[in-house]
């Protein structure tokens, strides 16, 4: 499959992590070990699991790690809604981040489908 660094979904997840780190640096300091920390852990998990999965030998293992990335992405969405409702994020920044999340969601879904189809094809031969 190649290295994870060649995957557009990984590149976009890395970009999302940078955006999130910059935005959460503006959150109130009392949130550093609470919401800020949870958001950062969730966003870092996305590209980290993509890279870990791509390093596995079995395609089914790769799919497993992509699904973990997907779960972290949905967790991130909820945490960002909380940040928005607490006025830690403004609507414009939230929408920009949401667009990146939507892109990564589509890319993860497609990659999982492509790998699943390859697994099914190889099992029929």
Name what the model sees in each region.
Residues 1-125:
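Short, C-terminally biased terminal segments at protein or domain edges
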């Amino acid at each position: 499959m190649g290295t994870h660094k060649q995957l557009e979904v990984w590149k976009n997840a890395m970009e999302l992590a940078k955006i999130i780190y910059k935005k959460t640096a503006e959150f109130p300091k009392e949130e550093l070990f609470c919401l800020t920390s949870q958001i950062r852990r969730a966003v870092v998990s996305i590209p980290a699991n993509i890279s870990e999965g791509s390093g596995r030998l079995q395609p089914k293992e790769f799919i497993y790690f992509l699904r973990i990335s997907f779960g972290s992405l949905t967790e991130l969405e909820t945490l960002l809604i909380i940040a928005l409702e607490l006025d830690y994020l403004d609507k414009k920044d939230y929408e920009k981040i949401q667009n990146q999340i939507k892109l990564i969601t589509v890319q993860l879904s497609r990659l999982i489908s492509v790998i699943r189809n390859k697994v099914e094809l190889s099992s029929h031969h």
